[in-house]
């Protein structure tokens, strides 16, 4: 089990808490908590817990690409059980859409 942490600049606070996906083979769970009210830090703090070691660069690249286009501030928790980069991107987009109340 490996834990990775990242911080990305974010332009908008996530308005809602979100839970998408499940921790199952080839999938991952994402928990998103909005920043505390009154917080001045506008960053996306990401913690990845993964069952697959050695993919630090891949995780960084996938997350950087996502947060470049979707900069939602908050605490992101990703619990991975071997998801491919495509599944990770899908779940991240689902979480962002749910946090914004269905608005892309």
PLM ranges: what are they?
Residues 1-104:
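N-terminal intrinsically disordered, cationic/polar leader segments
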């Amino acid at each position: 089990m490996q834990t990775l942490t990242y911080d990305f600049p974010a332009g908008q606070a996530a308005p809602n808490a979100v839970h998408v996906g499940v921790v199952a083979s080839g999938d991952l769970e994402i928990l998103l908590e909005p920043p505390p009210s009154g917080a001045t830090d506008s960053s996306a703090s990401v913690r990845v817990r993964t069952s697959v070691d050695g993919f630090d660069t891949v995780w960084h690249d996938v997350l950087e690409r996502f947060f470049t286009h979707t900069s939602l501030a908050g605490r992101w928790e990703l619990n991975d059980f071997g998801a491919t980069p495509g599944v990770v991107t899908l779940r991240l987009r689902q979480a962002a859409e749910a946090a914004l109340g269905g608005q892309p």
